[in-house]
A protein has these predicted regions:
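A cross-family phosphate/adenosyl-ligand binding-site feature
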Residues: 1-99, 105-177
């Protein structure tokens, strides 16, 4: 649910926000909620709109792309160039900086495969904000929580300082993974 707060705070800062939720994200938060928070229509699949090529338009229109939360599955698909959904296809199109905000169970976060996939993304100039430590889903605690919204915003916008005026930016948020 932090992705909803992220959208709200970015809008309060004067940025345009477009949300590209994964099917998993829509199981947690409905498209209507994302649309209400962002003030923009929500696309979740490549095939929803016949009047535009969604991943091309969305990817080209973004000044910054934030993937929050980024699951182990999403990280793996991005690291290996998958383009089988709107999120991954949009990542392949965008020239904007991409910020990855991992969120998963500690055992998954510490898994060698996840760490290797993150290294691949870092080599491609993706910016990774490490997960926070705290209570996880269920009764477990440890590393794996989505970073706090203020940290995500500060680190993400710092990537653009010096290159753009930091108001009225078009920020793409992908929710869930």
């Amino acid at each position: 649910y932090k992705s909803c707060d992220l959208i709200r705070k970015l809008k309060e800062l004067g940025h345009s926000v477009k949300v590209v939720p994964t099917p998993s994200a829509l199981k947690f938060v409905g498209a209507a909620t994302f649309e209400a928070l962002s003030g923009e229509p929500v696309s979740a699949t490549v095939w929803e709109r016949v009047d535009e090529v969604a991943h091309i338009e969305i990817g080209r229109g973004a000044d910054l792309m934030i993937i929050a939360p980024a699951t182990a599955n999403t990280i793996a698909r991005l690291a290996h160039g998958a383009a089988d959904d709107l999120l991954s296809a949009t990542v392949l199109v965008t020239k904007a900086p991409v910020v990855i905000c991992p969120a998963m169970h500690s055992d998954m976060w510490l898994n060698e495969a996840v760490q290797n996939n993150l290294e691949i993304l870092k080599q491609r100039q993706f910016h990774v904000i490490p997960p926070a430590v705290g209570r996880l889903t269920g009764s477990d605690s440890g590393v794996g929580r989505l970073p706090e919204v203020t940290e995500i915003i500060e680190e993400s916008l710092s990537l653009l300082q010096g290159s753009k005026i930091l108001t009225d930016m078009r920020i793409l948020i992908t929710a869930g993974g």
